[in-house]
């Protein structure tokens, strides 16, 4: 958050209390799609410590049983807010448990599609809805109506699929409206937020720009200066442009060329940010320093840590060279944190097990005694992209595929050398170039080439060769939690493979990775 004033105090907000469901973040996403601001907090949130009043409250699903000894329960103060409440799956069972304990194990678990039968279509929650497919994911069920409630919807296995309090705007549903499998789920969520909570649909990036610029100016004040690392990716570019709009040249961006960036990346980023966007940028070539520390290292986790630690060292050293004018002082560090990062840190089930170390600049705060400023921390990725376009950032940059913090170092499997990096980045450049020529770039979520630590026999002209292997990867995904490989035409892969083998010295063979996530991860390392 950029300044002391919370976004939830500036826009009508729906509070989503998370009981640990894998779908909880989708509730927030769906409401944002209707231009309604929604904020997710753990189910243990004390209402007295909230600091703002929501227009409505949604209780998410969760993997627990409400009757278990260690089951999480909501602060009963939500009922004193006198705002509409919607319980989803576990959230409905929580409402029932509080009002009569009519919850227990079901005769059979219910996972997958079911048919919702609306029996009271006069109720505003189901306005515009009829019998439809909904997504179930529960083992417990209501064994009777909680005190003061009536039934408004059923399914074949759930006689209490939808319930409502007879005198208060408190609703419960057994299914998950937030997932796409519930065909009219979006309608239900909109009915709740707009018709029942009367939340204004004014959460737009157009409104956010002015609000956030004012917050930044209040926080930074008229004299303090800000530094931040940029990578050429959408998050750091949007954050940097927003900061520049707010405080001008008092923001200092630093691009560290670590020797494992994409082909011509440093030069291209400098041209875009300085000439195109007017960002005050320093480019530091530390490629030899990074590559020397990576010499002989093959373990991917060690690569990530070496690059992360070296980055902090280089960034600190270069930041000390910045001398603000008129006795001004650098007091803040800009970071492009997004809302999914915030959700992961505050989710009731806590941060998930670390599969790979993520590259960030968290260590800089303690070392440099700076305060953190995160202007994008309330935004999802799609909102950041929209914001970037409104700020005049080129379309190609705004919709660029993700690139890992450790860069090509984790796309060169095995030891990272200057020569190996060059092979990988040239192959990657050809691959992305052909994807764009074919008009496929925006259909693919992420694509890249990586260099394998094996050699293969080949024939070039009349000569036998024994060179390296490139693996191509392209995936489709909506959330990067799961992903499927992209089904290229064979003719496209043939063209890319031919170009790479003929134009990149040291490559004898090209393969295409057709592994989904899971079991594989998106990156090879």
Swiss-Prot record:
Q: Which organism is it from?
A: Saccharomyces cerevisiae (strain ATCC 204508 / S288c) (Baker's yeast)
What is the protein's given name?
GMP synthase [glutamine-hydrolyzing]
| BP terms from Gene Ontology | GMP biosynthetic process
User: InterPro entries, per this entry?
Assistant: Class_I_gatase-like, GATASE, GMP_synth_C, GMP_synth_GATase, GMP_synthase, GMPS_ATP_PPase_dom, NAD/GMP_synthase, Rossmann-like_a/b/a_fold
Please tell me where XMP binds in this chain: 304, 462, 517, 523
All residue ranges annotated as the Glutamine amidotransferase type-1 domain in the record? 13-202
State which pathway it belongs to: Purine metabolism; GMP biosynthesis; GMP from XMP (L-Gln route): step 1/1
GO cellular component, as recorded: cytosol
Localization of this protein:
Cytoplasm, Cytosol
Gene3D superfamilies recorded for this chain? Answer: 3.30.300.10, 3.40.50.880, HUPs (3.40.50.620)
Q: Write down the chemical reaction(s) this protein catalyses.
A: XMP + L-glutamine + ATP + H2O = GMP + L-glutamate + AMP + diphosphate + 2 H(+)
The family database entries (PROSITE patterns) matched by this protein are listed as:
GATASE_TYPE_1, GMPS_ATP_PPASE
**What residues does ATP bind to?**
231-237
Establish whether keyword Secreted is in the entry. no
Q: Which SUPFAM superfamilies match?
A: Adenine nucleotide alpha hydrolases-like (SSF52402), Class I glutamine amidotransferase-like (SSF52317), GMP synthetase C-terminal dimerisation domain (SSF54810)
Q: Which GO terms describe its molecular function?
A: ATP binding; GMP synthase (glutamine-hydrolyzing) activity; GMP synthase activity
Q: Cite the record's note on assembly.
A: Homodimer.
- Indicate the segments forming the GMPS ATP-PPase domain, all copies: 203-400
The EC designation for this entry is: 6.3.5.2
Q: Active-site residues? A: 89, 176, 178
Does the UniProt entry include the keyword Ubl conjugation? Answer: yes
